[in-house]
Regions:
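A generic local secondary-structure boundary/capping motif
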Residues: 97, 155-156, 205-208, 244-247
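Long, charged N-terminal interaction/targeting segments
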Residues: 1-96, 195, 249
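N-terminal segments that mediate ammonia production and transfer
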Residues: 104-106, 224-251
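Cys/His-rich short segments
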Residues: 81-152
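Residue-level signal for inorganic ion chemistry
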Residues: 65, 130, 217
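A phosphate-binding glycine/aspartate-rich beta-alpha loop in the early core of alpha/beta enzymes
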Residues: 161-225
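Gly-rich Lys/Arg/Thr-decorated short loops/hinges at beta-loop-alpha junctions or inter-strand turns
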Residues: 2, 133-137, 225-230
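Phosphate-interacting basic helix/loop segments used at nucleotide- and nucleic-acid interfaces
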Residues: 144-162, 199-202
Length: 251
């Protein structure tokens, strides 16, 4: 028997991490304890999960946690180590409701492959229930009402007419640049595999694009690009269920 501890150190609170720590108290195969060092409203936070058991189930636990704890832009370090005695607890961490955290996309690694992959049987099921992130609870009635047929029609309109007002998301999409103003142009990346063909990116920028927050990042187009003429662009991946599915259709 050995004790291990898995740490996730963040520069600020990440409500989803606290929620996932709480969920792992239900992991019956091992003795689990959890905690958060410096768990307050400001400053660095280290979320941790401790487990006691034999080598094989401990390895299975570590693999499961690595899959569940998706990258956050606020994550600064993570690790696993052997400890002498657990320091955590069996009580739930106090946390803000992750469903109300607007900085995190309303989908995760469990539900996205089901509704966001064009080869999946439930592709386009915007209101798909997820037992992990519960992203469906954060959808508006207008978002929930959209079907795959609706989204395909929107994509067709964008392709044929050149623009689309996506009222349920409060945005407009266009195949051509909008009228220039003081702000940087913003681009939705529909095919992540083409990133390096268009932009000069570092590894940490690619990781940030794929993080649970799905942020806009500033990127410079490659030299002599035939269509991207601005010096800098704000780019992002699909950051909501609707935009993610629409991106997959347009891909």
């Amino acid at each position: 028997m050995k004790n291990i501890r898995l740490d996730f150190t963040c520069s600020r609170q990440v409500p989803l991490y606290a929620y996932l720590c709480n969920q792992y108290l239900n992991y019956d195969a091992l003795n689990i304890s959890i905690g958060c060092d410096n768990h307050n409203d400001f400053g660095p936070q280290t979320y941790f999960i401790e487990a006691q058991g034999e080598q094989a189930p401990l390895e299975q636990l570590a693999d499961a946690i690595a899959a569940d704890f998706l990258m956050s832009v606020w994550l600064v370090d993570s690790g696993i180590k052997v400890i002498d005695e657990p320091q955590g607890q069996r009580t739930l961490l106090e946390t803000h409701d992750p469903q109300m955290d607007k900085s995190v996309a309303a989908f995760c690694q469990q539900c996205y492959p089901l509704f966001g992959d064009n080869q999946a049987a439930q592709f386009g099921a915007i209101d798909l229930t997820c037992s992990c992130c519960h992203g469906e609870t954060r959808l508006t009635p207008a978002q929930k009402a959209l079907t795959l047929t609706d989204l395909k029609a929107m994509a067709e309109q964008l392709i044929t007419q050149g623009s689309l007002a996506l009222s349920c998301e409060g945005i407009a999409l266009s195949l051509e640049p909008f009228a220039r103003d003081a702000s940087r142009p913003q681009l939705l990346i529909c095919n992540p595999n083409t990133l390096n063909a268009h932009f000069c990116l570092k590894d940490h920028q690619v990781v940030a694009l794929s993080s649970i927050e799905k942020p806009l990042i500033c990127a410079r187009p490659i030299q002599d690009h035939q269509k991207l003429f601005a010096p800098l662009y704000d780019i992002c991946f699909g950051y909501s269920r609707v935009v993610a599915v629409l991106s997959e259709i347009l891909r």
